[in-house]
């Protein structure tokens, strides 16, 4: 289905230890995490909070297991803080990822975000940017995009539940306001379906701008509970809203077909944050790997 040497398969460490709720998977070590990723048949991962920041140490640990770093999340605060604060941290993050050989930097605006707040209802309290904040976001992303390109990297914007860029309309607005040469898109199946969007619409419309893909599935019965009981994003995660591809309600056949027939070249990263005490990370990594092999031939 996919052209040879176009796709690398990664998996996010958030299934082993949750960055937003470190108590989930606190017992799982960095070495266990990356060893199980390799055993499950993945080529790389994104960066978690237990990963060494010393690039020499990190490279050695990964090379022993034939793994690479695909990318790492970066929180921007362009709508709520002076741009200099975001830029200073971004440059450090960019240089770290450049040293690790990554090609894309995952960015997500966290100004007014409720994704990390345990008791704030996800759908009821979703943030909405003002026009002034949209302008700050677009201008700031252009600046970060130029900084990334100084080292041969691209920024990929992660639309995300509980943030100001979550819905189809918000993704379209961001894409309309930004330069395709400077700002690319991260396509995340799970966040789109969770929000009630049509993922294939976004995939088709912005195919040429998508430079990173997160493969995530949804347990619809949990999403329904989240809406009915006005739960937060973190409560949704703890209750199992997300799972690996093939274990939920999302149909991936068309997603894979569209991407296979495109010029997409890069990473597919399985990102399915759930409680590792309830969903063994290694077992679910194997499930995901088997599903991707069967459905995408990768």
UniProtKB/Swiss-Prot annotation:
Needed cofactors: glutathione; Co(2+); Mn(2+)
Classification via Gene3D superfamilies: Divalent-metal-dependent TIM barrel enzymes
Metal-binding among keywords: no
Top EC class, one word: lyase
Keyword terms, alphabetized: Cobalt, Lyase, Manganese
EC numbers for this chain: 4.2.1.44
Catalytic activity: scyllo-inosose = 3D-3,5/4-trihydroxycyclohexane-1,2-dione + H2O
InterPro entries documented for this protein: IolE, IolE/MocC, IolE/XylAMocC-like, Xyl_isomerase-like_sf, Xyl_isomerase-like_TIM-brl
Any Pfam family matching the protein: AP_endonuc_2
SUPFAM superfamilies: Xylose isomerase-like
GO terms of molecular function: manganese ion binding; myo-inosose-2 dehydratase activity
Pathway: Polyol metabolism; myo-inositol degradation into acetyl-CoA; acetyl-CoA from myo-inositol: step 2/7
GO terms for biological process, alphabetical: inositol catabolic process
Keyword Manganese (UniProt): yes
Superkingdom in the source lineage: Bacteria
Annotated family: Belongs to the IolE/MocC family.
Name the UniProt record assigns to this protein: Inosose dehydratase
Organism of origin: Bacillus cereus (strain AH820)
């Amino acid at each position: 289905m996919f052209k040879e040497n176009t796709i690398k398969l990664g998996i996010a460490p958030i299934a082993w230890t949750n960055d937003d709720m470190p108590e989930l998977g606190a017992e799982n070590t960095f070495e266990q995490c990356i060893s199980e990723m390799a055993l499950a048949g993945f080529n790389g991962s994104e960066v978690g909070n237990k990963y060494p920041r010393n690039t020499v140490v990190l490279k050695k640990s990964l090379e022993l297991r034939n793994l690479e770093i695909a990318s790492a999340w970066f929180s921007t605060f362009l709508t709520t803080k002076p741009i200099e604060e975001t830029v200073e941290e971004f440059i450090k993050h960019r240089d770290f990822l450049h040293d690790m050989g990554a090609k894309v930097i995952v960015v997500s605006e966290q100004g007014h975000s409720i994704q990390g707040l345990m008791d704030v209802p996800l759908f009821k309290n979703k943030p909405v940017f003002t026009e002034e904040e949209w302008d700050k976001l677009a201008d700031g992303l252009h600046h970060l995009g130029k900084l990334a390109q100084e080292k041969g990297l691209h920024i990929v914007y992660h639309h995300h539940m509980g943030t100001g860029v979550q819905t189809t309309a918000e993704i379209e607005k961001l894409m309309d306001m930004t330069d395709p040469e400077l700002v690319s898109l991260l396509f995340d199946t799970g966040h789109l379906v969770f929000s009630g969007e049509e993922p294939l619409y976004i995939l088709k419309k912005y195919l040429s701008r998508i430079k990173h893909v997160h493969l995530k599935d949804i347990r619809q019965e949990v999403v329904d509970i989240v809406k009915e009981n006005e739960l937060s994003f973190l409560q949704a995660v703890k209750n199992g809203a997300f799972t690996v591809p093939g274990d939920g309600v999302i149909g991936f056949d068309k997603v894979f077909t569209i991407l296979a027939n495109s010029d997409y070249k890069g990473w597919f990263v399985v990102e399915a944050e759930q409680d590792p005490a309830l969903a063994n990370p290694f077992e679910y990594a194997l499930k995901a790997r088997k599903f991707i092999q069967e459905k995408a031939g990768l």
